[in-house]
Amino acid sequence: MGVEDYHVIELVGEGSFGRVYKGRRKYTGQTVAMKFIMKQGKTDKDIHSLRQEIEILRKLKHENIIEMLDSFENAREFCVVTEFAQGELFEILEDDKCLPEEQVQAIAKQLVKALDYLHSNRIIHRDMKPQNILIGAGSVVKLCDFGFARAMSTNTVVLRSIKGTPLYMAPELVKEQPYDRTVDLWSLGVILYELYVGQPPFYTNSVYALIRHIVKDPVKYPDEMSTYFESFLKGLLNKEPHSRLTWPALREHPFVKETQEEVEAREIHTAVVDNKAAWMLKGNGGQQRNEKCDSVTLVEDMSATKGLADVQSDMKSAVKVNSPPTEDFVGFPTQEEIKSSGNPTLDKLENTSRTVKGAQVIGENDKALDLVLLSLERFSKSPDSKRDKDVACSVQSLRIISNLVATRAIVSVGLIEKITCALLDFTDALVGMKSPEFNNIIPKSLSVTKNLVGHVEGNNIHSSYIRHWTKVVEIFIQVVRWEEEGTGRIIYEACSCITTMLSRVAQDLKSSTPDSVSKQILEHANMSRIVDHLCLCLASSGSSLTSGSSQMLAAACEACRAIWILIDTSETFFKNDDVNILPLDALQNRLSQHDIGNSEWGPLSEKLVDTVTRAYLRSKHVQVAVGHCLHQRVEAPLVSAIQLLSRCCLHNGILPSMLCGLPSSLPITTVVSGGEDGTVISEIFSILSYATLSSKDQQTGEKDNFEGRLNNLVFHSCLMLATVAQCLKLTGRNSVLLMLTTSPKKHQHRLSAIANHIASDDKIEASLQNHSASAMLALASILALEKGSSAGSSVSELVVSLIPRATKLCYHLRPMPSNEGEVISHSANYAKWHGLLDGCIGLLESRLKWGGPLAVQQLIASGTPLLLINLLAGKLSNASPEDIKKTSNRIGLSPIGVVWTISSICHCLSGGTTFRQVLVKIETMKLITCLLSDAHIKLVKSWGGPGGGKDGVRETINVIIDLLAFPFVALQSQPGSLSATASVNSGFILNIGSPGVRVCMEDRDLLKAIEEDMDKYIIVLLEVGVPSLILRCLDHLELKDLVRPVAFLAKMVGRPRLAVDLVSKGLLDPNRMKKLLNQSSPREVILDILMIISDLSRMDKAFYKYIGEASVLQPLKEYLTHVDPNIRAKACSALGNMCRHNGYFYSALAEHQIIGLLIDRCADPDKRTQKFACFAIGNAAYHNDTLYEELRRSITQLANVLTTAEEDKTKANAAGALSNLVRNSNKLCEDIVSKGALQTLLRLVADCSTLALNPSKKETASESPLKIALFSLAKMCSNHQICRQFVKSSELFPVIARLKQSPEANIAHYASVIVAKVSGES
């Protein structure tokens, strides 16, 4: 016998093994299950194992084991025919959740008998689970699916290969220890426990947690469980295999031992079944004759219709061809299983449509089809009250059409359109009646419609497609709001029609000549707000799933698919299918934004994404539905859900945090444990673990195809992890704990789950595979959340071991020559918003960051810096804009990849020769600074993916500034430099974490080289136009993002040549200064701008004119009273230096009433502010006496500083200021004396005199304020008699006379001058 001896009725299941159909043995009424297993892709070992399974099954004859009736194979496939059992025990669990103990006991008795039979025949099932237990007629339990079964020889004791379902696996299996037949007994215990309780004894979504529970945790038994039942389960669920209940004691246990009545009933049932089977076999001959006879007289006359003779002739010829038929298909149930409509013509048409040839005959005859459609049209047009009598005929017509569609018997476009219209009208009429009796018909009609609208000849979408679309949308909008039990299948099929049609539209829009109908459909989708209704479908599905029902699960999956296809198609439409050219590629090939098309999303797409994002954020039910789509491990909905969530993350900055389970009100700088179990991020990591385990266990003939599907899951899962991590990073969140939780074990598991999908170091692929590239990207993106190699983080112990070796990473970064010697592009078709090399370069940057100085030196020695420079240069052949569009992502670096590349180069600067190779070479600097050009910045800003937009522009500019600032940081950080010892210095923010800081501590030779080449470097900066580039960058950034650019300006201002260039290029433009000195500016920006003003003022009086024109005095005045003491101090310092060289600003200071505020700062509680205020007062009095009257009030404040200040420099500034107050006139001399300032100066001299006369080796008198105090007294006594008289009469005058003997020359000199002036000596 062969497959030709069976009718194939319908598909009942499928999996990696193949497909299972419901069938019927010809000429009998025997219903069978037919399992088809393809040989393609299977090894000889696999085929041998399949034959072994068949042989095992063939020998088994038991009432509780599915019986194999037949088997055969050809060159392409195996077919195993078994008895047909109606449902799975799994379905009972889904519907009823749990069963009463009496029913569980009845099932247990049958399963025990089945296992007793198997084990007595030395066969281990090895995959006991509810899905492999079927329920046949009379509630007879049938054990099936022996794909993992293994026959043991008489010498076999234990086996070691691991198979089975984790939930039902015994402890010895999960521990990969030897096992025997008792593993089946453990699985039996788990199944019975689940039937009674509602879930297995150990249940969790995490494979690792599940294994831990199975091995270590005790089983908890419900209190209401009977003693016998609990005793039986304890005997089975014993973690020690040798202590489990086994044969023969098992079959004699009171819980499963059969009573005499049960034995007798079983024997009677077996006899009846055997007799029925024999009767069916004996009836073959007669049944065959009847079937042939019926086929010959297939169609009777229909008096009211013309043209049937032609149909009848065709039918008869079809019968001749089909005796016996050699090809069957999946359609509606057989004629024996359905109720006839009473229309003989339709009966015979349906009978003929059941064979492929017969269906083709009907499909080629328009008149026959008109007969079939007539009842559908009549039903659609009749009033509701008259439709009841048309139902049977309409349903029969539907079955006929289903058969025709299943065999693709209808090829005419016109007929397809006609049938589709009729079906949609019929379905719409059924939906409008809102009658539960049609709940089984509507989904069947929609299913057939879906097949029709999905089958469009060629690439053309006909004008009628828009009519079909609008009707499908109308139907979907009606049914999606149905909440009655049993409507889940209807909503699913309606949603599936939407998905199918959108998929066809997407395909059309990607063609070279898209049809206008496709665009009309997108416009209608927008106007009808179909995405809102799809979100409603998700919400309804989530509500149903939350209540414990799974009827809406398929609808949720299909809604996810439909939403994503709609969004993706809208973006394709907006871009007119322009390839997303990466900004770096466009820059290197001199393409403008116009040349590369629009790299943003588009208004319709943004609107759709916004709708979905809002629905997800607001509705817990929508979140539940999408979560179930992820959890199903079915490729299409899972990938759609991942892409949808990834896209929403790019649209809304809240969503990435939400997917990690972070509190919505969490401050950016606060670090908490994210990615805990139950979050979406946790589920994504579980998918990666699932893919790893599945790829190891996969042994079927479809291995290549299965591996491809797993790689696709890995690809999209890793891209989502990367997107979430990058979004968190771009919003300022910096910690891997946000995604990996605070558990070190989870750090290990999750990072390893990603790393497992990166090819091992000993296997370097000729080209980087997409899933491997995305795994690299995910790992790099997560590691980038850590700012530095913190020893306290468990990640630091994992990072270096997980990152591939540098040789492998660098291999993929090298140009790939083609056969003709030209360099070919990286990643022509990788991902829409990522570069193929992003992950590779990101891991290289992580290795440099985490690997320490040794890693840096090794990579430098291997030529990595030059490799990175060449990568940025895009060492590719010149290409036209058209060629670039054909091969997108030529260099393979997205904006984030570019940032990581620059960062990697920056890390290499601390390793010796790289500084001269990169920063002192003008060609290299031109290449790097080109990334700061308006052209590139605009390209990055318009980039729609991660690393684009305003955040991407900020990151791009900042990383290049870090690179350019390296020499400045290195020199400022060396011991003894002013900036190294200052608490707040110019551009200090750039010093934090910079490799330049390490240079002064680790490499004195490099520091010396930088000092030698600094002048050359400054020349290069000027030649490539860095000062003007940085100034233009300020215009591209938001105020909050100006910290690092302004810090770099502050560092450059410290070099005179750069300062001159900056000022000439508009650094001090009034509008710019107004913006930067605004109260809303970041604190660091304000401090650095104040420092810039101060440094320029101190450097050269030529800058006074530009500073004056910059209108900075008003903000300086305001900052004198700022709450931040550092800002007050910087403001005082700037004002002091603005008065350093001359009195240019004196009148302006008076006009803005600044002097009074400066005097108040002399009493500031902040030491630095007090010091710089005294300095500013002194300079305000130095050049002339214009401000003396305003400064009169400062005398008392300065005198107080001399007695209360803690820092000697502050006292020195106060003493110098007092001297300047009498330098230009005697206006303030009397106040100096009367207010005690002169006496305070004398007291200061007296207090410091002891040290001056006897200086120690560690501390000299020149470091005290004594010198300035003596200098001030000398000036006062030289010019003003009142001062001389006061000093001469003071009891402290002898102290000054003694200081003439000081070993410090200046002190002795000033003391001598004072004594001489006071004593009247020349």
From Swiss-Prot:
Deletion phenotype: Cytokinesis-defective leading to aberrant pollen and embryo sacs.
Tissue and organ distribution: Ubiquitous.
Tagged with keyword Transit peptide: no
Enzyme class: transferase
Effect noted on mutating residue 132 to A: Alters binding to Kinesin-12 members
Record text on subunit structure and interactions: Interacts with Kinesin-12 members KIN12A/PAKRP1 and KIN12B/PAKRP1L. Interacts with KIN7B/NACK2.
Family listed: Belongs to the protein kinase superfamily. Ser/Thr protein kinase family.
GO cellular component: cytoskeleton; phragmoplast
The protein's name in its UniProt record: Serine/threonine-protein kinase TIO
EC number annotated for this UniProt entry: 2.7.11.1
Residues covered by the Protein kinase domain: 6-256
